[in-house]
């Protein structure tokens, strides 16, 4: 199990999350073409284990699903009045903070009997990576910020009757985080790195109700996962002897709450050719009030404290499917995804903002037992203002982190591929 987790985390290197905050929406390849509209109701394949486990009652027989998402983000910072951290030079704009990323998911579902279904999913519900040039003007606020997760999610589904299905699952989630930055000590610059990891536990449940033979609605809930990341803080201050090494090279802890969400979806087969899908999802990002890292060396003093004060978010999506033939289905979708960070508290580590999704995709039934899905989405991200003022207080304090003031030009392209096989 440990080898599986390490391999998955190394392979899963998401950039800035493609849903609000540091959430990852890419949990199935078939759903991307619909911008994940109707995810809690469509129950198209075993990836429903994540979006709504009740949907397993709609998936026939034993099925395995494997998906891979290629995420290509762009996030260019444009300076508009930043101020250096005296006495250090200002530095450059930082280049593209985005990084090409690959995100996989895997699902397996089978029948226990006609009414009870079992499945298990392995995916990455949250992730973040921003990385700037080491000499950029915001280096004292952050250079590299990375969060990786892996979620193992066994689930059961029950067909209560011809109209109602229920599902329940549990989650074992591993999280690993790394933060790096430059440190201004007046006489020179030095670097610091903080990293830690932990396991956390949560659950999910959902229901699907078949209103008519062609129309159903679904609702699902995923719980928060609370973790206490434990790790190390490291720096290269020793040569200057300006700050006691024990305060900078030390064990650290940080509380991390990965938020709960609620989704309500609808799916309707309008006629032999067209399907209509919709979804509304609420996520409780307001729990992310502060990024606080504490020394675990007996002092319990604060090493890093950054106010975040995020807002809860809504995501709205709508989509259509066109059944071109018995073996080919075409998809299109739109979504509006609210950002969790406001301008007043936006940081260089997570320059989050609202997103608009435009998605296309197709599903091809290659053989009676094997299906291939492909999807593409472009995310239009609103112009993202930032004014992170961490200038030093009035003398005699000789140090500070400077002021990062400007705007991000950002967008994301996502390509997903999925293979589904029935045994």
Indicate residue ranges for each PLM-predicted region.
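Gram-negative bacterial Sec-dependent N-terminal signal peptides
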Residues: 1-19
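Active-site-proximal flexible loops/turns
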Residues: 9, 59, 286
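Residue-level signal for alpha-helical transmembrane segments in multi-pass membrane proteins
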Residues: 12-16, 68, 362
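Outer-membrane beta-barrel porins/channels
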Residues: 20-35, 39, 83-93, 100-423
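Transmembrane beta-strand segments of Gram-negative outer membrane beta-barrel proteins
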Residues: 23-38, 57-76
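Outer-membrane beta-barrel pore proteins
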Residues: 39-44, 49-62, 108-113, 160
